[in-house]
């Protein structure tokens, strides 16, 4: 999972203006970096121009995903990431960056701004921080921990039953489980095996 670009733009009536951008082109060869960066800027502007105000979208281009968020006040953000990067985290990043940007940069400067004239320095740190979505986004971190716990629990149950025992045999021999619980287990087992075949 990788983020390549984080841009803040202004969607004007006649054209879209790049206000500030941060790039991570370290995974590209040295000679390709400037061209890749220019292409990301061009793509970001084009996507914002073609998007309606008040919209969010994800545009796939080969193995990359461009996530765009255009607010109703014409301020827009674009994240370019690989296709594995979680969309929810990308949109969370865009919302956070646009909120910070609108608080720090006067709205009057948006239509005529440029990367040289706009004084906002938060993009590089945000791009770096969100490279690992698990660390940056609490929900993703919790989901990853749940997935790991589920794997550990699954492995533990399998290791308990590896000695030639079957869970079905243990359930039928159990003195703790009532008749109703055993019937419920057998019914659930049949339904799950039926669905697994399909």
From Swiss-Prot:
Keywords: Coiled coil, Cytoplasm, Cytoplasmic vesicle, ER-Golgi transport, Golgi apparatus, Lipoprotein, Membrane, Methylation, Palmitate, Phosphoprotein, Prenylation, Protein transport, Transferase, Transport. GO terms for cellular component: cytoplasmic vesicle membrane; cytosol; endoplasmic reticulum; Golgi apparatus; Golgi membrane; plasma membrane. Residues 196-198 form a propeptide. Its main location: cytoplasm. Palmitoylated; catalyzes its own palmitoylation. Palmitoylation is required for Golgi targeting. Farnesylation is required for Golgi targeting. One of its GO terms (biological process) is endoplasmic reticulum to Golgi vesicle-mediated transport. It comes from the Eukaryota. The modification Cysteine methyl ester is found at residue 195. One of its GO terms (molecular function) is SNAP receptor activity. Residues 138-198 form the v-SNARE coiled-coil homology domain. A lipid is attached at residue 194 (S-palmitoyl cysteine). Its EC number is 2.3.1.-. It is a lipid-anchor. It is found in: Cytoplasm, Cytosol; Cytoplasmic vesicle membrane; Golgi apparatus membrane. InterPro entries: Longin-like_dom_sf, Longin_dom, R-SNARE_YKT6, V_SNARE_CC. This is Synaptobrevin homolog YKT6. It comes from Bos taurus (Bovine).
């Amino acid at each position: 999972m990788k983020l390549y670009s984080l841009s803040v733009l202004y969607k004007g009536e006649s054209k879209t203006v790049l206000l500030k951008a941060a790039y991570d082109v370290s995974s590209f060869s040295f000679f390709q970096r400037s061209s890749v960066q220019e292409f990301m800027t061009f793509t970001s502007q084009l996507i914002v121009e073609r998007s309606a105000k008040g919209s969010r979208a994800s545009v796939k281009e080969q193995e990359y995903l461009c996530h765009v968020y255009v607010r109703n006040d014409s301020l827009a953000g674009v994240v370019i990431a690989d296709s594995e990067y979680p969309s929810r985290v990308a949109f969370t990043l865009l919302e956070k960056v646009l909120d910070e940007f609108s608080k720090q940069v006067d709205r009057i400067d948006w239509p005529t701004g440029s990367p040289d004239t706009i004084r906002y320095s938060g993009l590089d740190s945000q791009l770096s921080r969100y490279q690992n979505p698990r660390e940056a986004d609490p929900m993703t971190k919790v989901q990853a921990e749940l997935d790991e716990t589920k794997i550990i629990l699954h492995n533990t149950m399998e290791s308990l039953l590896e000695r030639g025992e079957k869970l079905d045999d243990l359930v039928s021999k159990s003195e703790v489980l009532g008749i109703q619980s055993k019937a419920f287990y057998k019914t659930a087992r049949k339904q799950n095996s039926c669905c697994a075949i399909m």
